[in-house]
């Protein structure tokens, strides 16, 4: 069985409280042997740590998500630094970023948390997991100011030019359920022709289900559907795509090889 890696799963979310262990088992049965779990708020960090300690193949990232701005306090940035110091098994800082789609999120506050988390990641040599909705140009500008920073823009929804600018900076893009919808023509075109070394696959569970799972809670076991779609778009072998994207995730997040 090919070892798939879900590079972005919120398996710690409340939607999985009733069947989290079963969801993990279904993922493993589907070949998803590793998952990267980014957090969204400081209150989530202890439970995420407990989950990733208890279950093999789950790797934590800690950060402050822009959509949950009302749950953050400036002190959480200091807390994040202390938390990272105390938890060396952390694979990334995130999920963090900018969201200019939701009008009730203060842009200035978002920028403050975002910039601080980029600096924290850069200082520690950790990659970042980025949320960028209607904010990619500003995110790109922030990344250019921090040469050497590594990471991924998850659920990429930008233009081909923005994708190339990310690749020029060494950043990867995360692709999930949206690519399975025929209406996503721009995204599908980018994925079809992009350099494979910059591609990560994700489910963003419990959100963003694929077209065959529309309206249902998404979960990591759906990742093979993403693999199949992307392989078809690229006229590529699914096994080769699975191996290449898993290798990309292991390289970015310094994950062990879970095929053994």
Model-assigned labels for residue ranges:
Residues 1-260:
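Mid-domain alpha/beta scaffold segments of enzyme catalytic cores
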């Amino acid at each position: 069985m090919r070892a798939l890696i879900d590079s972005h799963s919120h398996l710690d979310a409340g939607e999985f409280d009733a069947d989290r262990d079963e969801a993990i088992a279904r993922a493993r049965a589907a070949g998803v042997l590793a998952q990267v779990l980014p957090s969204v708020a400081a209150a989530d960090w202890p439970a995420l740590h407990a989950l990733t300690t208890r279950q093999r193949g789950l790797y934590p990232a800690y950060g402050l998500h822009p959509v949950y701005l009302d749950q953050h306090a400036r002190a959480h940035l200091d807390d994040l630094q202390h938390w990272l110091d105390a938890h060396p098994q952390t694979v990334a800082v995130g999920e963090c970023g900018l969201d200019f789609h939701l009008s009730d999120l203060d842009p200035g506050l978002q920028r403050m948390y975002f910039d601080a988390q980029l600096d924290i990641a850069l200082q520690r040599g950790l990659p970042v997991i980025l949320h960028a909705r209607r904010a990619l140009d500003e995110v790109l500008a922030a990344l250019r100011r921090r040469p050497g920073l590594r990471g991924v823009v998850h659920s990429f929804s930008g233009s081909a030019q923005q994708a190339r600018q990310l690749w020029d900076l060494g950043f990867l893009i995360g692709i999930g359920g949206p690519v399975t919808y025929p209406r996503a023509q721009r995204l599908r075109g980018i994925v079809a022709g992009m350099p494979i070394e910059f591609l990560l696959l994700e489910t963003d569970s419990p959100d963003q289900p694929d077209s065959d799972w529309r309206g249902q809670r998404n979960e990591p076991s759906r990742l093979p559907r993403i693999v199949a779609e992307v392989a078809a778009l690229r006229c590529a072998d699914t096994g080769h795509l699975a191996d290449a994207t898993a290798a990309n995730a292991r390289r970015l997040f310094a994950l062990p090889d879970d095929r053994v």
